């Protein structure tokens, strides 16, 4: 994103990251952090599409909506309804962090 490096170096990084994500069989969970106030940004939609293009049956994408303290109750309910398996968090008031920790442990360690 914001690194001041040559275009060639960025392409090398992209290639290496792409290979790592696609070939690493030990990855069981991708955690996709999304700003809860901006749920349909192109960057998030593109990442979702990219991950789904190579997701294996034993892998999962967990959508985590951040900054939920900035939403009212009706906006939170709408978000939960639209994204059933997502987790809503707020670092400011620590909302949802226990749920996130539990889900990451469950998905990665099976506990």
Where in this protein do the model-derived segments appear?
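Switch II (G3) loop of P-loop NTPases
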Residues: 1-16
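Structured loop/turn residues at secondary-structure junctions
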Residues: 5, 35-36, 92
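Conserved C-terminal guanine-recognition region of P-loop GTPase G domains, centered on the G4
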Residues: 14-85
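Canonical P-loop GTPase G-domain recognition
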Residues: 67-111
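Conserved protein kinase catalytic core
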Residues: 1-5, 41, 72-73, 96
């Amino acid at each position: 994103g914001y690194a001041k490096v040559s275009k060639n170096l960025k392409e090398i990084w992209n290639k290496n990251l792409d290979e790592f994500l696609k070939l690493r069989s030990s990855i069981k969970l991708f955690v996709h952090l999304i700003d809860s106030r901006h749920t349909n940004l192109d960057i998030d939609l593109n990442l979702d599409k990219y991950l789904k293009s190579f997701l294996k049956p034993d892998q999962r994408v967990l959508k985590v909506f951040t900054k939920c303290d900035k939403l009212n109750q009706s906006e939170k309910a709408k978000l939960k309804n639209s994204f059933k398996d997502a987790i809503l968090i707020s670092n400011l008031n620590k909302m949802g962090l226990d749920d996130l920790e539990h889900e990451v442990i469950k998905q990665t360690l099976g506990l």
